[in-house]
Amino acid sequence: MHETGLIFTAMMPVFFIILAGFVARRVGWLNEAADRSLMNVVVNLLYPAFIFSYVLGNDALRNPIDAVLPPLVGLCSIVAGFSISMLLARKLKIGDQRECRTFAFSTGIYNYAYFPIPIVALLFDRETTGILLIYNVGVEIAMWSLGVGFILSANDPKPLWQRLLSAPVIAILISVPMNWLRVDQHLPDFAFESIDLLGKCAIPLGLIVIGATFADLATDVRLFERLQIPLSAVIIRLAAFPMSFIFFALIIPFPDELKAVMLIQAAMPCGVFPILLARQFDGSPEVALKVTLTTTIVSFATIPLWIGFGLKLLNL
């Protein structure tokens, strides 16, 4: 019961900040013109600062193997998610090719950053949050390399290496060796305080933009038409995938910090970023929104159940 209360405590701010972004858009405080600049600040400044604040001085990341295994697990989870979701999209006859690709991309990738980071930070120690950030590098690589095959590759003129080297990935590539070399021990206190303050802004601001995006698309989407799309996404993302994640965490002797990360990621709904990609490139925004919005709403009930079950089963 205590664990369930902690999980709800970690979840509630996330949902309320998203709601705040939704309201801010609807009442006109946050317009669409501001979205791109805000996300640029989050992705290129605040989120890298967040990464530095959790990686530097993190003893759990001093071992080089900890910089290899978590990203590998994260990458494999997304590759499997995309592959299974595409196969099922075709079997279930979700729609035309464009809609199947969007369904596979949206269902195959979970909300790997904005939701799990505050939950992990509250339920586990600082070292586990660091492992989560390293794990997410593998997710990013899979999303940009394999994911673009569903939505981006035909239209994005940038070469693959430019898409892979996002600011968060660069921050990981710099901060991990700095942590190995214990450079943090030679930095002044004001540098850490500045990085920490910037990093604390990343998640709230990103969630506000997510809420605003929901507000934009919710008015146009016909949520209760073609119910096989959201229902299939809920079954795949919030039932089948969590069971698979927890099963592999149970049978494979991963470190406890990585098992904790796998558990939290297992419970996550579909990611929001596919909505933005489908909106800008050759995807179906309606399919992406149905998948993301439905799994996000349902996850409010399923996240505590899966995390509570996994904590006991994995003895975390």
Task: Mark where each language-model region is.
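Alpha-helical transmembrane segments of multi-pass small-molecule/ion transporters
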Residues: M1-L316
